[in-house]
């Protein structure tokens, strides 16, 4: 009798475990893990609308934002694409200046501009989606994915949070004849140079923060190795296409150089393409504020990433030096003694500058893009004071 009860109990336990397993699989299919027919994880739009803003709220904030814009940017001198939204709803946007002075094209809401290092926010998102779907892990050694990668202690996480200790490819390829500047450098070439020229680390891995574009060039290679797609195609399939980001693409130096919006020095002199413009992951995404808003809004979807991964994304990792600035997994942050953490990412490449601000608590998105060099772009952080407990003042002078 005892053995029969024991057997019956075991059978019930097996049925229970199977049912739990099935329910988890169903939840994954509908929730955290969104995988397309090709086995590629895809970012899904937010299905449920966020609370609708009142007309009074929109008018109040629009007044403050528009005054800031008009005081900061001039139609005679600036090229800028600017957008402020809350709950995915646009409060104010403005577009002015030349996208291309040679052709006379102007900046419009549909005109893609180079978003520089804001590209890192999208690259890191694609990597975290691969982590969420268990295709890779944060602690996985990079040399298990990229063949001949020369630094055995570097992990995916230390690439994401800039603690790998690697040197910037822009410097070591320029030095000592390490690369022929007449030839376009590729992501694969970076690995080749690091190996053949025995490029040393700047510091031991995971001993301190060192912002380095090489980290995100390697992450782009990881995306390629894991998905079997080239980075531009992977980003389109994983993020751009499912979110309807129709004006967003990764620059292809072989076919896009004559159709992109060029960048300019502050004196309006056009800046040409150089040997570093074939590298992607750290930069080279072209987009619009409206497309980037689609991306940011989708990050509020309940199953964007699992909660634990989101927590890791928005935490600081580098506290060796005192200060309030830190870096998460693809996002910069300022951790004030009082008030909310301030999450953002700035960018600068050639004459392109960019600023992407995500006020998480308030669900506010602030985006500024410019293809004519200016530090005014980074002043957008002051707008946070209109929406929450952030120690910025709209009337502060100076540039950062």
Language-model features: locations:
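Short, well-ordered beta-strand elements
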Residues: 355-372
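Bacterial N-terminal signal peptides that target proteins for export
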Residues: 1-10
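Short, gly/Ser/Thr-rich active-site loops of penicillin-recognizing serine hydrolases
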Residues: 338-340, 374-400
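C-terminal motif of bacterial Sec signal peptides marking the signal peptidase cleavage site
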Residues: 19-21
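Bacterial signal peptide processing site
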Residues: 23-25
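Short, conserved catalytic-motif segment at the N-terminal edge
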Residues: 54-113, 135-139, 395
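Short, surface-exposed loop or secondary-structure junction motifs
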Residues: 32, 40, 154-350
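Active-site-proximal loop and beta-strand segments within enzyme catalytic domains
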Residues: 43-50, 89, 98-211
């Amino acid at each position: 009798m005892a053995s029969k009860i024991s057997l019956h109990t075991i059978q019930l336990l097996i049925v229970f475990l199977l049912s739990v397993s099935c329910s988890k699989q169903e939840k994954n299919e509908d929730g955290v893990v969104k995988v397309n027919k090709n086995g590629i994880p895809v970012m899904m739009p937010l299905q449920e609308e966020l609370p609708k803003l009142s007309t009074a709220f929109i008018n109040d904030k629009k007044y403050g934002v528009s005054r800031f814009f008009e005081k900061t940017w001039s139609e005679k001198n600036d090229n800028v694409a600017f957008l402020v939204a809350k709950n995915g709803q646009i409060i104010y946007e403005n577009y002015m200046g030349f996208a291309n002075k040679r052709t006379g094209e102007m900046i419009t809401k549909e005109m893609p501009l180079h978003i520089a290092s804001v590209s890192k926010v999208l690259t890191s998102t694609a990597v975290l989606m691969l982590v969420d779907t268990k295709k890779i892990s944060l602690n996985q050694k990079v040399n298990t994915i990229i063949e001949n990668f020369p630094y055995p202690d570097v992990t995916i996480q230390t690439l994401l949070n800039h603690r790998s200790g690697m040197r910037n490819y822009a410097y070591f390829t320029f030095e000592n004849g390490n690369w022929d500047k007449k030839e376009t450098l590729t992501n694969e070439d970076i690995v080749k140079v690091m190996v053949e020229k025995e490029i040393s680390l700047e510091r031991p891995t995971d001993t301190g923060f060192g912002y380095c574009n090489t980290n995100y060039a390697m992450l782009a290679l990881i995306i390629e190795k894991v998905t079997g797609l080239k980075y531009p195609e992977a980003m389109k399939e994983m993020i751009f296409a499912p979110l309807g980001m129709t004006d967003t693409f990764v620059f292809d130096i072989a076919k896009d150089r004559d159709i992109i919006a060029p960048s300019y020095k502050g004196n309006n002199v056009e800046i040409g393409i150089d040997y570093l413009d074939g590298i992607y992951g750290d930069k080279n995404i072209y987009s619009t504020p409206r497309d980037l808003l689609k991306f940011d809004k989708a990050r509020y979807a309940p199953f964007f990433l699992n909660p634990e991964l989101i927590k890791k994304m928005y935490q600081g990792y580098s506290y060796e030096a005192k200060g309030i600035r830190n870096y998460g997994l693809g996002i910069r942050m300022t951790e004030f003694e009082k008030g909310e953490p301030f999450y953002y990412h700035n960018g600068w490449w050639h004459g392109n500058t960019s600023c992407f601000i995500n006020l998480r608590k308030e669900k506010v998105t602030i985006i500024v893009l410019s293809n004519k060099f200016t530090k005014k772009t980074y002043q957008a952080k002051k707008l946070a004071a209109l929406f929450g407990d952030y120690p910025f003042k709209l009337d502060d002078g100076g540039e950062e």
